[in-house]
Amino acid sequence: DEYAVAIKKAGFDILTTANNHSNDRGSEGSIRTIEVLDSLKIKHLGTYKDSSERIKDYPLILEKNGIKIALLNYTFSTNGIPTKSPNIVNMIDTISMLKDILDAKKHNVDKIIVITHWGGEYKSFPDRYQRKNGEWLLSNGADIVVGGHPHWVQPIEYRKDSLNEKVIAWSL
């Protein structure tokens, strides 16, 4: 709880919660995290108490200065700890991600930003799994993909064609 308070005091107002440690403390830990973030009015995405909460709050839509964005968040793993129903941890899965991207587009957003928790630890370049899923996300509607987990900064790539500009930060 103190960590969440410190994050709030430091100025963070949005957190992604889908990562390989999402289930470390079981359902109780996941629910407690969500409740503490809600009590502090810190917006969050990636883990949910149940499907009705996910439907209500996902994708996270933000609008500022006339720019409307959708935030999506997924993880590659929960370290082998299964997610207990009714809790939800957004996993990297092309079927779910495509549905979420299409849902985000229904909100007439200017940009879709996908935050992924992926990649091998202590690697300075993206692995095959990251590349496959990152390219898939960009090809299927994500404008910006921001990865994390390797504990290293990995390359950032800018893509531009006649219609679009896209960015992928493999790991920050």
For the regions a protein language model found, what residue spans apply to each?
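Acidic, metal/ion-coordinating pockets
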Residues: 1-172
